[in-house]
Amino acid sequence: MAERYTAENLTFTRSGRTLTDNVSLSLSQGELVTLIGPNGAGKSTLLRLLTGYLKPDSGGCSLAGKALDEWHPQTLSRYRAVMRQQSQPGFDWQVEEIVGMGRAPWTRHPEPSIVREVLQLTGCLPLAGRRYHALSGGEQQRVQLARALAQLGVTERRAAWLFLDEPTSALDLYHQQHLLRLLKSLTRQGHLHACVVLHDLNLAALWSDRILLLHNGRIVSQGIPETVLQADALAHWYGAQVHVGMTSGARRTAGFSRPLA
């Protein structure tokens, strides 16, 4: 399995509006990349294009030099998983069964040992035995992360590509840090790539290996956090005053103060 997931000249238009405008990028194993930008910048659309859930008007994506639509869906699902903003299955299964769904590309038989290992890894073991629809929004997000990791077989340290759309939106502060710390730990092992849509610039600053800043469907800045998170640039693209500081002299942190007049 090649170590790159690439997109070339992606353009996507809907209702006369260009949501993704000639975007090219390359994603490597062993890194955590975040997509940031104001509302309407095209972050979620780009994520859907990267994963093949949307078809671009022009351009395309490839894994291991092979276009996504040339992969057999079951085989592709062994290497690429997606965690959406919201996921409400039409059946009220127990947590273990929801996580076990992630193993569908591999087997039709239950794999309780793998499910339990992933539940432990994601801090979801206390949720075992509960009905999915009875969980809070944050608990459901954590279970969906466990499902995606089970799908990719991350406990087996395989090449894998995980795409997450605002995975921290319903989480409290502790679980936001836990989720991103886990992703960082897994990517550092060198097998997993994580591409994450985030609105919280502070989280992006603290955990990203690389940041892509989008505006009006284009990548307007990309690089390490120290390069992208510049106060003047963020104020320009977000239309708000931004405070940028340093933590331990190494990592930038960014927070909004007030909109620009």
UniProtKB/Swiss-Prot annotation:
One of its GO terms (molecular function) is ATP binding. It is found in: Cell inner membrane. It comes from the Bacteria. InterPro entries: AAA+_ATPase, ABC_transporter-like_ATP-bd, ABC_transporter-like_CS, P-loop_NTPase. Keywords: ATP-binding, Cell inner membrane, Cell membrane, Membrane, Nucleotide-binding, Translocase, Transport. Its EC number is 7.6.2.-. It is an enzyme of class 7 (translocase). Disulfide bonds: none annotated. ATP binds at G37, P38, N39, G40, A41, G42, K43, S44. One of its GO terms (cellular component) is plasma membrane. The complex is composed of two ATP-binding proteins (HmuV), two transmembrane proteins (HmuU) and a solute-binding protein (HmuT). This is Hemin import ATP-binding protein HmuV.
